[in-house]
Every structure is written in C-alpha cells, then in structure tokens.
C-alpha cells in the first residue's frame, strides 16, 4: 500500500500536537523585519511576532519558501516510494502554492499540489481531514475528493481593527483603504473565490458584535461540523466569540493565535472565524 504524506505551509494555524499526531510536514515561509529575516517556524511563541512588528520601523514583509526548498522536502519525503499531497494557502495571498508546484516538477517525487482557496484554520480543516484519511490508508483520489468537499463547505470570515496593514501589504485596493481612511475602522470581510470581500465596516466595537449576532442567527439553520477562531493581539474578543458560538457545534472550538504571515497583513487586534459545515 502506497503511503500518502501530507504537506502544507506555515500560514496554517494548527495545534502542534495535531501536526505530530497526524505526521504533517509544514514548510515555513519567512518574514523580514527591519532587514532581519526570520523563519516563520521560529516565531511561534505566543505574542513574539506581534512585539517584533510593534517595534519595527516598517511593515514586515513575508516571503514564500524557495522552490528549491520544496523540491528538497518532496525528495526527502518520497524516499520510501510514497505519494505526497501538498495543500497550500490561496494563490491570492502568496506565491507559495506556485512555488510548491515548481518544486514538485523539479523533484522525482509523486506530488499532487492543491490550492486550498483559504489560509489559517480554514486551511487546517483540509489538511487535517486529508491527514486522517491518509492514516486510514485511503488512496489519493478518495482524499482529493474529500478535501474538495471540505473546501466547498468552508467559510472564512476575518475582522480587522485597522485596514492599514492590508493596504500596505497590497491585499486590498488602496481605493478601498482610502475611502475607509485607513485607521480606526473596523471591518469584517469574507474570503470568497480567492478574494477578501467586505461585509460590514464601522468605527466602534459594536461593528463586530452586530455582525456576530447575524452570523449566529444563520448558524441556527445549518449543520456545523467545526469552528475555529484565530486572533492577533488580545484574545478577549476571541474567547467571547467562542462562548457565543460553542452551542452551535458539538466539537470544541479551537481558539489559536494566528501566525506571523497572517498577522503581517491583518495587524493587531484582528480575528478570524473559520467554519466548516457538514456535507
């Protein structure tokens, strides 16, 4: 039986114990802060990256893993003749998935590369489900089919307390940013079809609370498989959201600090709600 190994990138927000238990390989992106390059793998300590970003003169810059790194990792993982499934963040956020494809073409490994259309814990949903099926001995076709199902039943919502980082990082248009006067604006967006689509914006904390109330109303009519909550900065609002949402899903909600790659673009006091519905 051919063993299938699962690879993803460090934009995924996931519990370390799951990575170990499911034998997931995470390829780190890098972050440059005031001309010093850090591997994302070295910035996982709670609050460490946020402090570096607050102290930096310029907005940090993220870089995808080099093609050669992917090629080496793929080559190493296939030494026993197994197959590899690499699931990465949306191409709209980073060139990582394309670097993985190029790395696969340079290696002798049997690699299938998938664009998750998401990032953070929404990427985790696909990666974890794929890894579970791989451990059960399912073939590539069955795993890919299930990953597609998970993708099609996932929603990613992100709330930011400033649009400055998203605009500077080129992740939303400058026009949108200027109309919102950049600072002190709270916005909730949905990632859909590889785009961040604005849903609501306003100046006070009520912006987030009103939107959450509307989300909860919609959840009561749907079968929720799992929910993840990620945050940057204080986790107070994340915990408050968990208390409000836990009644709508059987599985415990994961509340995790998002990594440096996402924090670079969202800034401080941002959050995300990631929802996977039953097929």
UniProtKB/Swiss-Prot annotation:
Hexadecanoate binds at residues 62, 94. Residues 4-277 form the DegV domain. This is DegV domain-containing protein SP_1112. GO terms for molecular function: lipid binding. InterPro entries: DegV, DegV_C, DegV_domain_contain. Disulfide bonds: none annotated. The lineage of its organism: Bacteria, Bacillati, Bacillota, Bacilli, Lactobacillales. The keyword Cell membrane does not apply. It comes from the Bacteria.
